[in-house]
Regions:
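Conserved S-adenosyl-L-methionine
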Residues: 2-112, 117-121, 125-128, 173-176, ...
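A conserved structural/catalytic subdomain of Rossmann-like adenosyl-cofactor enzymes
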Residues: 104-351
Length: 351
């Protein structure tokens, strides 16, 4: 419906929550934050995975309407204690949740499905001047198409800044980012690999979001940089197609979610689906987080005995000889028919 812009598909929210928290986690007193919370789909999935009585929710979103819906969501999900932490405002220019000394508050879990592209030319320079917070820089203002400014790059940096030293986070981003070759995109990508913050990337099927045709991926961060290998998954072929009005959409089914979660947790290599690679391997591949670039190219060789080889060659030769003979016969037949043709002066004469 019309609130699609505030909504993350539940399946993606489940994948993010299960992978960040685990399926048998026994956590207490943890903090969860979303800097672009919308109506709270990601936060609700996270709270449900942890246990609503074991966590506190913090959020900020520029939309008053979605913040109101998030408050309602908290009440319906036994999270009323977190109501004072739902804030309407611009997270990038005026982050609300701070420590007493004025620095950004740090959380155990941070999740985000931020806007990808937005005209933020009016406060771009303000952000760019804060080089500590935006360590990889801020996209410049283009001469045309200001609404194509990649604001999500600011949210990636803000998310990482908002994690405790052992905190974990996940963010939905356009898939183009994971093979970025230049600009702020490239600086963010190299930093999250060099610092070993990113430990997983899942590329989702096309058309999983109601409001965008953009292909999306989910990045997973561990501020403790404890992973030895990064798990990369190409889930683009999963899910089932359905129609929403005139639009074709795709949704992940329960089996798809389980496959993604189990493959990710076990860091399994599955042909044409997933691969676990070291940070050095990622650097060798030009910092690509695209699973497909690491898949082996397979050439199938068939083992045969010398006798089988000789039999096959004899059959090929016999077949070729037969075809040559047939060709020669046809050639002679055509030549005979051509020889039999004579010029007839009376053809076409009515007399």
């Amino acid at each position: 419906g019309k609130y699609a812009e505030y909504y993350t598909p539940r399946a993606i929210a489940q994948v993010m929550a299960r992978l960040l928290v685990g399926d048998e986690a026994n956590l207490r007193g943890v903090t969860c934050y979303d800097p672009s919370a919308g109506t709270g789909t990601l936060l609700m999935a996270l709270a449900h995975q942890i246990g609503e009585d074991r966590c506190t929710i913090f959020s900020q979103d520029i939309s008053e309407k979605s913040s109101e819906m998030l408050r309602l969501n908290l009440i319906l999900n036994n999270l009323s204690g977190s109501l004072p932490n739902v804030v309407q405002g611009n997270t990038l220019t005026e982050p609300y949740h701070k420590e007493e000394n004025g620095s950004l508050r740090k959380f155990d879990f941070v999740v985000s499905n931020p806007p990808f592209n937005l005209d933020f030319s009016d406060f771009r320079d303000t952000l760019a001047s804060d080089t500590v917070r935006f360590w990889a820089g801020v996209p410049s203002v283009p001469a045309k198409k200001k609404d194509s400014m990649s604001i999500y790059l600011c949210f990636i940096q803000h998310l990482i800044n908002s994690l405790k030293t052992n905190g974990k986070g996940a963010i939905v981003i356009p898939t183009g980012f994971i093979t970025a070759k230049s600009g702020v995109e490239r600086k963010v990508l190299t930093k999250i690999v060099d610092n070993r913050w990113v430990y997983g990337c899942i590329s989702m099927p096309s058309n999983v979001f109601a409001n965008t045709g953009t292909n999306v991926s989910v990045l997973f961060f561990d501020k403790a940089a404890s992973a030895e290998k990064v798990i990369l998954i190409d889930a683009s072929k999963l899910g089932e197609e359905y129609k929403e009005g005139k639009n074709k959409k795709r949704r992940l089914l329960k089996d798809d979610i389980d496959l993604i979660v189990n493959t990710f947790k076990n860091k399994e290599a599955v042909e044409d689906f997933s691969v676990a690679v070291s940070y050095d391997e990622i650097k060798e591949k030009g910092y690509s987080l695209s699973a497909g670039q690491y898949f082996d190219i397979k050439i199938d060789y068939v083992d045969i005995t010398e006798e089988e080889f000789n039999n096959r060659m004899a059959n090929y030769k016999a077949e070729l000889s037969r075809q040559f003979a047939e060709s020669h016969r046809l050639e002679e037949e055509i030549m005979k028919q051509l020889d039999a043709l004579h010029f007839n002066v009376n053809v076409g004469n009515n007399e």
